[in-house]
Amino acid sequence: KSAPKHEWIGKNSASWALCRCNNNWVVRHNSKEIPIEPAPHLRRVGILLDYDNGSIAFYDALNSIHLYTFDVALAQPVCPTFTVWNKCLTIITGLPIPDHLDCTEQLP
């Protein structure tokens, strides 16, 4: 919650990001970029927040491949933020979908 509201995600000490830049993937935190090698062809990204043990991990969710883990000291609530430039974004929590929701759209 302490991240500046008008600043790119990953450009400060209160946010972490996985970004695609020119067909390469990087993780960002506090204005530092670390390339993910080799550059994966990601179709689905998994994010695991372990608040109690202080880590945020990014995964290739389709292939169950770990991409990067940040060790973090969290003192405030964490708010997920997602940005997609020109494609579709679907958020899956890993929890079962309640029966009362109409979920007719199929994932590719």
From Swiss-Prot:
Pfam families tied to this protein: SPRY
UniProt keyword annotations, A-Z: Cytoplasm, Cytoskeleton, Metal-binding, Microtubule, Transferase, Ubl conjugation pathway
Catalytically driven reaction(s): S-ubiquitinyl-[E2 ubiquitin-conjugating enzyme]-L-cysteine + [acceptor protein]-L-lysine = [E2 ubiquitin-conjugating enzyme]-L-cysteine + N(6)-ubiquitinyl-[acceptor protein]-L-lysine
One MF annotation (Gene Ontology) recorded for this entry: transferase activity
GO biological process: regulation of microtubule cytoskeleton organization
Domain spans labelled B30.2/SPRY: 1-100
Gene3D superfamilies: 2.60.120.920
Main location: cytoplasm
Domain of life of the organism encoding this protein: Eukaryota
Subunit record text: Homodimer or heterodimer with MID2. Interacts with IGBP1.
Entry function: Has E3 ubiquitin ligase activity towards IGBP1, promoting its monoubiquitination, which results in deprotection of the catalytic subunit of protein phosphatase PP2A, and its subsequent degradation by polyubiquitination.
Protein family per UniProt: Belongs to the TRIM/RBCC family.
Protein name: E3 ubiquitin-protein ligase Midline-1
Name of the gene this protein is made from: Mid1
